[in-house]
Amino acid sequence: GDVYKRQDWLRGLIEFFDLPMSNASRGAARQSNVVLTLGGNSAEAAIGICYEIAYGQSMRQRAQNAGVLMTLTNDTWFGRSIGPHQHMQIARVRAIENGRWLLRAANDGVTGVVDHQGRLRGQLPQFTQGVLVTEYQIMQGTTPYSALGDWPLLVMLLALCVGLGYRMGITGVA
């Protein structure tokens, strides 16, 4: 989450640090998934706090035993820029990569529910106070990304570099 050392020294000096709820307490480096229980059914939820959702590998590891992804965020930092909408798009990519529905709660950004194919199934607009009531599904199984991670991309990049190097060696031009 948003944890800044010595941020108390900066309050009043830098406007950025005067935002409400702009600092959280540091938690343990490794945390277990949260178990959601509703109507007698329960499932693990992989949690990403704020911008943690931007890190595919981290969310991939958390999602291994989870049936749903969740992210809680404070998008106040972005103001009225396109930042909150980009943040939501990043979260949608995590839903697709992991084949899991994503529940996203934002106190000043876009709150929404995204299905396992990245489709927005419900949302509250930015700067709107309200409650989003919608349905979601608990998912199981793996996707190519959840099984292999970034390795296929790295192998393709390596092959491209080797191919370009080989071509430069033969023709002297890339």
Label each residue range with its predicted role:
Residues 1-174:
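Enzyme catalytic cores with a strong preference for nitrogen-chemistry domains
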